[in-house]
Regions:
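Membrane-embedded glycan-lipid processing machinery
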Residues: 85, 89, 116-126, 151
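Juxtamembrane loop-transmembrane helix junctions in multi-pass integral membrane proteins
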Residues: 28-35, 108-118, 143
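Membrane-embedded helix bundles of polyisoprenyl
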Residues: 44, 145-151
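Transmembrane-helix motifs of polytopic, lipid-linked glycan transferases
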Residues: 118-146
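Hydrophobic membrane-targeting alpha-helices
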Residues: 18-22, 49, 99, 103, ...
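Start-transfer (signal-anchor) and selected internal transmembrane alpha helices
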Residues: 1-50, 140
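Extracytosolic helix-loop segments that constitute the early lumenal/periplasmic catalytic or substrate-binding loops
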Residues: 61-88, 92, 99-110
Length: 151
């Protein structure tokens, strides 16, 4: 769980830094919105990290991603599509999976560990948070500050 806590702390720091820069000369209402949005996103991020660590998810997918990551590092990207395996993802995501497997090896995580499963889920978690940020940004223009937070 240490990796998740570090990632959550870094994410919170980046969000607060960005919010502080964006609203440093802004009115009190905008600064309050930035605080509430930061807290909401931090809570959502921590919730996803805790769920990602404690629940296995759909093990067929996560185990497949883990095996693709290990295979990409062992045979290389030039040979991975020539292997006798089921591989229906484009090479772009395989680069991400290979990087995650290198991180697993760097930290010495076993293939079956919940921490590595969380690491495999991290691109989806970050993409989910980015989409939520985009929805907040767009809805804030149409709905206003606080109604957008509830969307």
């Amino acid at each position: 769980m240490g990796v998740g806590a570090i990632a959550a702390g870094l994410f919170f720091g980046v969000v607060c830094l960005a919010a502080g820069r964006k609203f440093s000369g802004a009115s009190r209402g905008q600064a309050r919105f930035a605080l509430w949005a930061s807290l909401l996103f931090l809570g959502a991020y921590v919730f996803r990290i805790v769920l990602g660590y404690t629940s296995e998810g759909f093990t067929t997918d996560t185990d497949t991603f883990k095996s693709w990551a290990a295979l990409a590092n062992s045979v290389g990207f030039g040979q991975i599509y020539h292997q006798d395996i089921f591989l229906d993802y484009p090479p772009g995501y395989l680069y991400v999976l290979a990087l995650l497997d290198k991180l697993r090896l760097l930290f010495g995580l076993p293939m079956e560990s919940p921490a590595y499963t969380l690491l495999i889920k991290m691109p989806s978690i970050l993409a989910d948070m980015a989409c939520a940020g985009g929805v907040l940004y767009l809805s804030r223009k149409r709905l206003g500050d606080y109604p957008a937070l509830f969307l």
